């Protein structure tokens, strides 16, 4: 970091970072050290140190962040270099947003660009944190991006206002409701082609937002489920639409013995010393009975579950679709 701060040729040094992933990681670690000093609320001397650090490095942070953002936004790099570069850029924008000397508008812009860069670095956790520092409403972050970065641009053609605005709104809607990803990506590419010859900032910011949208759609759960159908079962378990039970080794042995008894039509005597063991055995016997009698459902509940109004619910269900077995 000292090399960047004290060296006059800042841009040349940052350009070298894009060609050396180890350099990027080293700089990120050094920036983290600065970050903890800047956020430390202890002692007056730390507060003075904050002012001194801000005075010395905030301009360099800005140069690093915008240079990396511009290069990574306009050119293609290997994934790891791109990820590390966006991570560094996001971190710089986050540091800049802590500068109390900036206007509220500039602080918001820094937080927004930090959130977008964290997204492009596949650091969703930090991206969400930075986004929530600006607004709670899902639509507002996209609206903020549009207004902050396009309202100062002078449009020469009326189609640009309508098309860019429509594209941003569609991206926002798609990300909130998680649908029409492919259509929006195709539409965004169409707008990008129209903006190719523009040098007033439209292409730069719209490409950046499109990159973030692409990364978010690639990592969306619906996209992953389409690519890996088995994930559906996993998601259903996480959302408690399905339940998964794991047997202990001793319980598995009981299950195996019952299977053997059913297959060979022999009687097996199983001794279980605890009440819980007997409960398990009763449940397993009922389970095997249910599997051999299609259409019959049984709900096994402990006695306590039939108290405080739950008994009525259980009886009502049992009349319509199942047999309720009270367990003592």
Task: For the regions a language model picked out, list residue spans one by one.
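N-terminal helicase ATP-binding lobe
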Residues: 1-328
């Amino acid at each position: 970091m000292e090399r960047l701060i004290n060296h006059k040729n800042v841009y040349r040094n940052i350009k070298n970072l894009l060609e050396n992933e180890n350099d990027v990681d080293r700089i990120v670690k050094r920036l983290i050290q600065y970050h903890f000093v800047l956020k430390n609320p202890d002692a007056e001397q730390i507060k003075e140190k904050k002012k001194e650090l801000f005075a010395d490095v905030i301009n360099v942070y800005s140069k690093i962040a915008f240079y990396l953002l511009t290069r990574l936004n306009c050119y293609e790099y290997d994934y790891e270099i791109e990820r590390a570069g966006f991570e560094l850029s996001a971190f710089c924008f986050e540091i800049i947003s802590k500068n109390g000397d900036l206007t509220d508008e500039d602080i918001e812009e820094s937080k927004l660009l930090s959130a977008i860069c964290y997204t492009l670095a596949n650091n969703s956790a930090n991206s969400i944190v930075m986004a929530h520092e600006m607004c709670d409403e899902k639509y507002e972050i996209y609206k903020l991006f549009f207004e902050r970065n396009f309202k100062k641009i002078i449009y020469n053609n009326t189609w640009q206002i309508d098309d860019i605005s429509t594209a941003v709104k569609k991206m926002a809607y798609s990300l909130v409701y998680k649908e029409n990803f492919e259509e929006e990506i195709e539409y965004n590419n169409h707008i990008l082609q129209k903006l190719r010859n523009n040098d007033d900032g439209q292409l730069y910011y719209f490409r950046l937002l499109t990159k973030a949208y692409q990364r978010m759609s690639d990592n969306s759960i619906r996209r992953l489920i389409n690519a890996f159908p088995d994930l559906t079962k996993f998601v259903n378990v996480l959302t408690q639409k399905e339940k998964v039970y794991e047997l202990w080794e001793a319980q598995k042995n009981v299950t195996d013995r019952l299977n053997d008894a059913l297959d060979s039509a022999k009687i097996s005597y199983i001794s279980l010393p605890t009440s819980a063991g007997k409960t398990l055995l009763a449940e397993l016997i009922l389970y095997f009975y249910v599997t051999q009698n299609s259409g019959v459902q049984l709900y096994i509940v402990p006695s306590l579950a039939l108290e405080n109004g739950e008994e009525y619910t259980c009886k009502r269900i049992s009349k319509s679709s199942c047999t309720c077995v009270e367990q003592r």
